[in-house]
């Protein structure tokens, strides 16, 4: 199995978190002929890897069906966490778990797939690439969503 790294909250100098920029992008969903919701994992993977939406969707659907014994044959209602974990780590991605961290605490130097509660998003050099502006949360005092962890791409 893949290695997991734990990363503590890393606020910027002086304790202030710098904001993240946002770019709206559907990851190729519309071009592939899909509409709707619950495809954040597919979008994030496509936006970071450049793979086609259909290819990633087919791979994740197959893996979810296989991992659940056919109980969940489709990813139409979303991709289960163990499925995207196995998919990404199987391709050499490394998961870093974060403790007491919020979205702005993600590293700014590179491409990552961020995992927040009930959502996954692409981060490119400190900019959120997503179908909707997912940078903020009303559920936390800071106004930012908790960062549960992030995937880093395989070393070149």
Regions inferred by a protein language model and the residue ranges of each:
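Solvent-exposed, well-ordered amphipathic alpha-helical segments
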Residues: 6-8, 17-18, 105-112, 123-128, ...
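Active-site nucleophile-adjacent alpha helix/oxyanion-hole segment immediately C-terminal to the catalytic cysteine
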Residues: 4-74, 91
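Conserved active-site-adjacent core of cysteine acyl-enzyme catalytic domains
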Residues: 64-118, 124-133, 141-142, 146
